[in-house]
Amino acid sequence: MMTVLKPGVTDYATPNDTDIVVTRVLKAPRALVFDAWTSPKHLPNWMTGPDGWTMPVCEVDLKPGGAWRYVWRKDDGAEMSMSGFFREVSPPDRVVSTESWGPEWPETLNTVVFTESAGYTTATLTMHFASKETRDAALKTGMKEGMDMGFARLDTLLAAA
């Protein structure tokens, strides 16, 4: 049975042993969602995870082969970072990139596809992990909760645009 998604609700699926598929319907045109998802002007305003975190470093060279890097800082001074390279950039339809949380985590391949219908954009992010163990470990990090908080901020950002 197919799940009907509503704006403001994020769906998380594990269709196989190595993938997580995250789907979110956003009330905004695709070009605007693509820009918010890829621009260092907008990313620090919504992709911050749980309350108390900021993104003081957001570097994006949005082209095939270009690098990206995010650094988050918690209000107590703790930091975490993630980086990768863009493999494919097709505005406003699709972005494929690698993701690394450091040497202790195997690289992930992320593909996000943006589709628009009747003024709403569906963002479908497929995260491909090296193994079931790595995928399951990612799910146990609080990833869903952090992403849900970020997506709520993205909804607010898009509504104000």
Please place each PLM-identified region on the residue numbering.
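A short, structured loop/turn motif at beta-sheet edges
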Residues: 30-31, 62-63, 87-93, 113-122
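A conserved amphipathic terminal alpha-helix motif
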Residues: 1-6, 130-161
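Beta-strand/loop substructures that line and gate deep hydrophobic ligand-binding cavities in soluble
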Residues: 96-145
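Hydrophobic/aromatic beta-strand elements that line small-molecule binding cavities or substrate pockets
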Residues: 24, 57-60, 82-88, 99, ...
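Hydrophobic ligand-binding cavity/cleft-lining segments
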Residues: 1-52
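Short beta-edge strand/loop motif at the mouth of beta-sheet-based domains
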Residues: 21-22, 41-79
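Intrinsic-disorder/low-complexity, polar/charged segments enriched in Ser/Thr/Lys/Arg/Asp/Glu/Gln
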Residues: 17-23, 55, 67, 81, ...
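Hydrophobic pocket/interface hotspot
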Residues: 33, 43, 68-70, 86, ...
